[in-house]
């Protein structure tokens, strides 16, 4: 009888510890989305906009922000068509450079001809990244 009580007690303690561990892990689900390197914030949209799709899939970016101004936007690994993605990188990503976060959120950037879906996806990634920055800086 005592053995059963001890076993139940051990099981309850183990279950409680597991629940606590899961709770703590889920509390920091946004870890890695925004980091700070010296005085520059870096927002990575890989998790933040994982549902945003270009022509072939997700189009995550890293947004570098210093003094509330966008320094640069870096394209991260994706499955977009290389020819079209090269156009997006060359013609679209630098459009936000030098803008304040608020101005960038209000600016309507044109899509790149021939890479419309990829362009729209990048624009949405940038929007979500900047909104996240504003809420969490």
Model-derived features: positions:
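Flexible, solvent-exposed loop/hinge segments and secondary-structure transition points
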Residues: 8-14, 23-137
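Repetitive helical segments and hydrophobic/amphipathic motifs
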Residues: 17-18
